Amino acid sequence: MRVLHVCSELYPILKTGGLADVTAALPPALAGFGVDSRVLVPGFPAFINAIKDKQLLINIPSRFGAEEINIFLAKISNTKIDIYVIDAPSLFARPGNPYADSSNQAYADNYLRFALLGWVAARISEGLDAKWKPEIVHSHDWHAGLVPAYIKASELASGKKAVKTVFTVHNLAYQGLFPMSVFAELDLPGIFLSMNGLEFYGQVSFMKAGLYFADKITTVSPTYAKEIQIYEQGCGLEGLLADRHNDLYGVLNGVDPQIWNPKKDSLIATNYSSTTVATGKAKCKLALQQMMGLAEKEDALLFGIVTRLTEQKGLNLLIEAIGEITSRGGQIVLLGSGDKALEEVFLAAAKKYSKSIAVQIGYDEEQAHRIIAGSDVIMVPSRFEPCGLTQLYGLTYGTLPLVHKVGGLADTVIDSSLENLADGTATGFVFDEFSVESLTLVIRRAFALYNRKTDWKKVRKTAMQQQVTWDSSAEKIYQIYKNLVRENN
């Protein structure tokens, strides 16, 4: 079976969030089921610089505002992944991150940049590469939301059955919304600009295009698949998603054990397993305290936070709960960036409590590994969380997740309640209500369990025994593909 993944990020080359981890880990996991996967990405500088053995497939005349377009098939250094890269310098060779300039302002022509991505995916689905034609095209998030639309448009124009499409929602809150006027530049049938298409409350929505035109929809946890069908978390698309509930699947993300594995992680102070976790984590904790300038206290309960600094991630709650941690002798290490006001608040807290709180603004993959290995608790107090990978990394490293009961957090962390402690199923700490009071209470429970060393060690061992790799999830994705291919034959 041949599958083309279409995305804008791919670890370790280009990453702004968990999307990159998923698109890098899923193709190798699917290979175990006989799936031949390739990836299509925009020609951002990071990708252009990382590819090797590139072959020019085709040169395309000016389109979507691009002066020159070359489609390359290449390899990614140190991987077995075949990758198609759209080299269109006028659209993709820019400073800043993939979506915004160095001032964090979204590029005004993002609709053209990602329309080209979708359009090229449709051409590959039709046989642009004479030696490899996909049976499934699997697109990820709004950046690739037009992929199913272009494939459907091609099917309508030719009268020929198109390949089947899968669209994965990694975060419904990011929708790719643009003024209605841009539709004329997208080269799609006029009938697609309607409620039964891209139109979304007077705008064009790339996310809605994927949700409406894809044959099947997946999202990244069973709970999130339910949540997005109701008003509170549907982001205005709950009606469409409820209508398509029979085509909607919640499949948990997984952890890539080649990258996240305390037994062989070269980025942490010392390696450890579930049998050597006590001494291993103690060394990692001391190394983290030394690196971040915290007081070197082995008995201090150390809370790690690796996140985007946004309101969605629950950082507003955490600000109010800082005193609960420091007053009990706890420590905090935070790595992240985002909202400037939040950055300033956490930097001020670190200045005030310099031996108890350390803050590093920005994202550093190596530091993320060190924080997760060296912390006792990893905090993910998100208002909503489609899946979350950080808590899965925490489980893997014996760093107990403290999470809000939403989305994938609810699916992957079992609270250390009395009954769960008694039956040996507890793996972390869960709070139900999104409030400062609820977060404060669960922090107090974390301190209480930490003071009961025997129980803490049992929960940590159970956490590390959880099966959070891609094996099970990849099989579920494969079954979706298999059923679609069967329908098309």
UniProtKB/Swiss-Prot annotation:
Pfam families per record: Glyco_transf_5 (PF08323), Glycos_transf_1 (PF00534)
Catalysed reaction, written as an equation: [(1->4)-alpha-D-glucosyl](n) + ADP-alpha-D-glucose = [(1->4)-alpha-D-glucosyl](n+1) + ADP + H(+)
Residue numbers binding ADP-alpha-D-glucose: 15
Any one annotated GO CC term: cytosol
Documented EC number(s): 2.4.1.21
Biological processes per GO annotation: glycogen biosynthetic process
InterPro entries listed in its UniProt record: Glyco_trans_1, GS/SS, Starch_synth_cat_dom
GO function terms (MF aspect): alpha-1,4-glucan glucosyltransferase (ADP-glucose donor) activity; alpha-1,4-glucan glucosyltransferase (UDP-glucose donor) activity
Pathway of action: Glycan biosynthesis; glycogen biosynthesis
Top-level division of the source organism's lineage: Bacteria
Swiss-Prot/TrEMBL keywords: Glycogen biosynthesis, Glycosyltransferase, Transferase
Enzyme class: transferase
Function: Synthesizes alpha-1,4-glucan chains using ADP-glucose.
HAMAP family: Glycogen_synth (MF_00484)
Family label: Belongs to the glycosyltransferase 1 family. Bacterial/plant glycogen synthase subfamily.
Protein name per the record: Glycogen synthase
Organism: Francisella tularensis subsp. mediasiatica (strain FSC147)
